[in-house]
Structures are given as C-alpha cells and as structure tokens.
C-alpha cells in the first residue's frame, strides 16, 4: 500500500495497518519458496488457480476459494504458506495473533478493525494465528461467555469477508476446534512434519547458491536417518533450515564454500539425541532394527 493511499484512511485504520501489516517482512518470497507434500501441493495449486481466475468467476456470480484453514504442528509451513502466497501475488498480509489480542482485553474491536481495513485495502490476506485460542469446541474455552461472544463476532466478520480478500487461519490443535468455525472455511489443509523422502529436497532448497553441496552419505546412513525420523516428533522444515545454516556457518569458519550431506545429517541426528559417535550410533540403531549390510 502506498503512503499516499495509507494517509487517506482514518487514523485508527492507519494505526491498525502499521501494527498488523507484515508485507514488508515477506519481500522476496514466492510460491517456489515453500516445500509442500504432494497432497497439499495439489490442494494449494487448485487454490492458486482459482485465485488467478477469480475475475472470470465473478462474472458468473462465483467466488474463488478465499477462506483457508491450516492444521499441523509448529514449523510445518502453515504461516509460511500465507507469507509466500501474499508475496507471490502482491497481496497485503495482516497477521493477527489471537492469543495476544485475547489478552489485550479488546479482542473484538481489534478483529473488526483488521477486517474493516481489509475491506478498504482489498486484495489482502488476513492471517489468524492460533485460532484455537478462541474457536474451541463447546465445553472448553467456549464456556466463557466473552469467548463465545468473540467467536460469534468473528463468524459475522468472516461471513462478510469481501470477495477480493482472503482469510487464512492456523492451529496446532485440530481436534479442539469448534465445528461451526471449521465449516466456514472452503479449504482445509493438513500439514505434516516432513518425512525423510523430502529431507534431501528440503536441504537443497535452503542452501545458499554460493555454496557447493556434496552428497556423500551412503545408504546405511540414509537408512538410519529414515528410521530415526519416523519416531521423532520434533522435526520441521524450520529445523532443517537451521541445520543447513549451521553447516554453512561451519564451512565459512573453516575457510570453505562447500559442505557435505553427512555434515547436515550429523546435525539432524544430534538434534534427535544422538550423543555417541555418529557411525557407531547409526550402526547400533541399524543392528537393533535388524537392518542388513551395515
């Protein structure tokens, strides 16, 4: 949004824009920046196609998918999808942490202000993070009359969402969401932690172009990593990026512009609690699992 256009808004909406808009922080991202599993990619590709053909839909009284709910553990790409989509298509992105606004004591007014701002700005994404903080199934948080009033208010705001805007929400607690809240979304995406089949592709995605990446891990190491990851609940794309950056830093500190697959794997294994010599630990694990050709 240009400064000139911003100045034309009422002061309270200018303040809302400055507080919730994160558009400048996502510059340079695009839909190639995010790694998606095949299932989610199909869903997201359809979401993108509808968005790209939205003007054609409008002519026939149709609306593109514009309410998206993402489930999944932290670090699996829920927030990053909103950032990449907004940056790729040049949309304003307003991020609302529902846990924070609840504690502010003025939650509905804040939400209403963001939705009103989006109506003025148009072509924007409202991203509701930690939506489980208010949209819990009856019998939990919703016993609180203030929370019930807030969720009912949010329903009305979502139902009146301008067709040019998109509302995206994210939660780690799929099972606890209010069913009426879930039904208001056109698209539901289930994000999983990356399985091993995606680890190598993910590593390469995060490598700086000035670094050379040497794939030197043998099949035993790869097998051990695959088996280990199956039972590790903390793995995320964000962690993989951290491991790649750590390997790049080590290379720089040692006067190199290259690092190996094994180096990154070592960080992965250490983060999962491997304290022995890597190969000894891997060998022991493979033996315990009955793997052959160690």
Regions found by a protein language model. Give the residues of each.
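C-terminal alpha-helical "lid" subdomain
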Residues: 1-33, 196-294
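Post-transcriptional modification and biogenesis factors for structured RNAs
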Residues: 36
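Walker A/P-loop NTP-binding motif of AAA+ ATPase domains
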Residues: 39-45, 49-222
